[in-house]
Amino acid sequence: MGRLFVYDENMTDERAKITVAKMAAVSDIVASEKAFIQYSAAGQLTVLAGAVIAVGDAIFQTEETTLSAANLDGASSFAHGKDYYIYLCNNGKDSSNEVYLISENSTFPDGVEWDDTNTRKIGGFHYGFVRNVDEYGREVNTSGSVRGSGWESNVREDIAPNSVWTALHRPKCDPSGMAYLGNGLWADIYLASDDGANGLQSVYNATPITGTEGLNWYIANEKAARVGKRLPDLAEWLIAAEGSPQGLDGSNTNGWTATTNTARTAVGKIKNAISVKNIMDIAGNVWEWINELCLDPTAASWNWYNVMSGYGQIYMPSQTALHALIGGGNWGDGVRCGSRAVVCDHCPWNVSTSVGVRCVCDSL
């Protein structure tokens, strides 16, 4: 390791010279507001002024700027269910201010002039369904009444405001397909699906992973950990679920819940099936493992039970006494599905085709 800067009042030592390249080398992103990119209107974001960002060997200070589909690197409009990434680009001209591009590419924008040396990913967002809420974040109908007539369908297609992230305001894991719940916690917008690498992902229109793929509570935790996520506890899950409509016996209008359904379905397809935190399918489709355990209060035969062959034994008051909570409801549970629906009788080693998982992650 060598010295990058030294003191030399005569400036004969190159290390004494302060250059843009040197400043860029020691700079990261400095901003008074971590969330320096924010949702501002339908289909629009605002970059706040004053953030200092190094891009390659250049340094920019942001001016207040509105971003929209006009900043896309290819298409003319945002596509439903897609994750987008925001790039600050250096076109190499000292006379030019920063250039912003929005791309579906997670490495650098499309265009022969752009690569990882002259662009920097500074944020992103998800585009999909958004539940309309009042100033307190409560579910309302089109007249503004909390849970007033027709509130369930008061949903629009837009940038999910709480999915907007920056390099400073984001989860510790990959932020794709996630939304901010508050208090330093992010949640998957969609039920988890197999990422093809023995982990989990939050992706629109995917098939939710369940016991059909061998999932139980233990395996759900392991797969979540591989991608830097975890299972929510009950309080966290309830926050994510708030404002998602109760299921219906005879219809899939408010979620994949009709009692005539026979199997899970692709995630994110039902417009009304969304919470005030813009979390999809949390009531219906498949139950969700929760990081909350309890014991059967009626059991009294304490002993070692070999319920997980090859993984050790559990000392508990019966062979099925240890339970892990599941929440939300499944495809055929009808009115039993909802934002506070919980079942307390599933053993964590159970492999059920109707139980999946949704992950959360703490803020960086």
Name each model feature, range by range.
Residues A197-N198, I290-Y305:
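Cytochrome P450 core scaffold surrounding the K-helix E-X-X-R motif
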Residues E213-L215, Y311-L364:
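Disulfide-stabilized, aromatic/cysteine-rich ligand-recognition loop
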Residues I18-G81, G92:
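Glycine-rich, flexible loop motifs
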Residues M1-T19, W114-D134, R138:
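Short, low-complexity N-terminal tether/leader segments at secretion or assembly junctions of large
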Residues N90-S96, L191-D194, S244-P245, E292-L295, ...:
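Acidic glycine-/aspartate-rich tracts in secreted/extracellular proteins
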Residues Y85-C89, W186-D188, K277-N278, R358-D362:
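Residues within well-ordered beta-strands of beta-sheet-rich folds
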Residues F78-L101:
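Elongated alpha-helical scaffolds
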Residues N132, Y136-M280:
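Short aromatic-cysteine micro-motif
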